């Protein structure tokens, strides 16, 4: 079985073709600047040279067809015909309260995706366009929607609810959903396998430019740091994370700006960028801190402290923890971040093997000592494989 995994953004389309027999990537690539000048497809077949196509892509339909052409190209392709593709798995951001698992795409499913445009205004419209483009390009092929919110949909209601009038939950489905769900599902599941303990209590720290933490027992989510939107939770590259809601009114009144403008500030001008004034990139802020920039150092300290605080909170929520797993761009590649966070966790019996922590090279690595009461792990996320697995289950 071969599964084509699609992740459609407003002007981009990322893809991987995965052979599920051995879970190997046959090819991957990205279409960029869809609907704009300078559209380009970068296609990388495994074991072959990269293939770049500069061609107008006025819409996602054209992009999907170019992807199929590249996959079947005589020199750079990996399949003889699109008939070899069994199904298409799509990353879809939001399903509201309707779906807590991956699902075969039907007209009803597309309506749910459409109805959630206001909950995922940047992603859901593009996700739906990608689904419909694939339906048109490959009629009759099953499409599967794998929702980013699905993993967090099953958290206990006490963890999901905001303490606001209940009618807002009933009327608008306002609750905590969580995001990065496909990554958390994959990493927590792989951690459970690694531990060999079916009911393992796992905290996953997905730390990239966007960042979130989840708590799970036996691979089932019990809490997660992002909320109705990805703005809640950790300090991120440009997002504030947790903030007193009254701050919005205070700044709006004093700066004479609208709520929408204030939300834009919290989403795009806050986080590491907001505190440091240097950059939203962890590496740039870390370097500025090392060079003596006090605001950059404060940004780094706040960033790490928030992670450690959530780990403590989730340890309490699960009445213990067996493993803490770091993943995503920063989590996988910043040994100093991992060390500084683990320095907060001595009360849990966490002991880091500093040599192992400094020598992680893109593979799953246990970086705690054998004596550590909690395993600390670095585990590369693989959202595409997770989507392919969910797709394969349904077709």
Regions found by a protein language model. Name each.
Residues 1-4:
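Extreme N-terminal starter segment of soluble prokaryotic enzymes
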Residues 12-57, 227:
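Short glycine-rich, Thr/Ser-proximal phosphate-binding strand/loop in the N-terminal lobe
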Residues 70-85, 191-196, 311-322:
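Phosphate/pyrophosphate-binding loops at sites that engage ATP/ADP/AMP, CoA/4′-phosphopantetheine
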Residues 71-123, 144, 150-159:
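Short beta-strand-loop/turn "lid" adjacent to the catalytic site in phosphate-handling enzymes
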Residues 151-254:
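Glycine-rich phosphate-binding loop of actin/hexokinase-like ATP-binding domains
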Residues 217, 223-258, 264, 328-359:
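Catalytic phosphate/nucleotide-handling subdomain of diverse soluble enzymes
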Residues 264, 271-275, 282-317:
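Adenine-nucleotide phosphate-binding core of ATP-dependent small-molecule kinases
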Residues 297, 301-322, 331-395:
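Internal helix-turn-beta structural module
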